[in-house]
């Protein structure tokens, strides 16, 4: 019963923020969301979970305090609480910094890898997907008030590079996915400078891919690369799905992740942001290295093990229709990209 109440609080907090036009109610939704998710992060109770929940609380509380401070400053200078009406440059800058901290974007990304490493995969799934929606909604609305889009461009490039370099030599899957999240969010923030609609489309597709990889890891009960190398012994189908989704996260054709990078690159080049596109692609090449390394180790290598584990491949496997649909969207959405572009009327 308590878990259901907390899940309802997370849902209501996010919805309140996403559909609010006032900074006060947006802040209130963020607070409801934060107070609901922290007790869930403590289960199962352990020293690592307690440490991660404390880090998450401090970072989110600082960000929320900055948001209410900046929105109050904007109210005193302009008399407006409306999110879409931001006239004070100091207030806009403070709110952008606060949203960067909430999203875990560079240069304020320090908390995200440590928090994800300390929680279980189920909470990692929520933090990496659902918890991104409310701050991203606010950031898209605030970005329309920016006179200088180079702020978003700088944040985007720093996040992609930080995610790429941070993911190198990681052996823990949750930390690796945290740096992957930082890198992909950098791409989404970058396209905000030229197209809000495209940023929404790429956000939804990325969250679907991220949802898929976390559900596969939960199914395989893998938190380290060595665990993933033995996943073939549990279920070969989930093992294959994991490899395909990793390649999609890396942005290789013909998978869905390639559509994200192709559409964003095309939109940026159409707006003469060629240097930014080159930097984003360079950062993605770094990320692609550890995706390919992980796929190679998962598909072709075998961690040191004993003979008993090689007989577990007949373990019962129960398929879930929703998870399978998410998996298909994660790897096979590229042929539908022309339809999606026309549907959302994206300006390339």
Swiss-Prot record:
Name of the molecule in the record: NADH-ubiquinone oxidoreductase chain 2
GO CC annotation: mitochondrial inner membrane
Pfam family, one: NADH_dehy_S2_C
GO BP, one annotated term: mitochondrial electron transport, NADH to ubiquinone
EC number: 7.1.1.2
Membrane-crossing residue ranges in chain numbering: 1-21, 23-43, 56-76, 92-112, 123-143, 148-168, 176-196, 198-218, 242-262, 272-292, 321-341
Localization: Mitochondrion inner membrane
Lineage: Eukaryota, Metazoa, Chordata, Craniata, Vertebrata
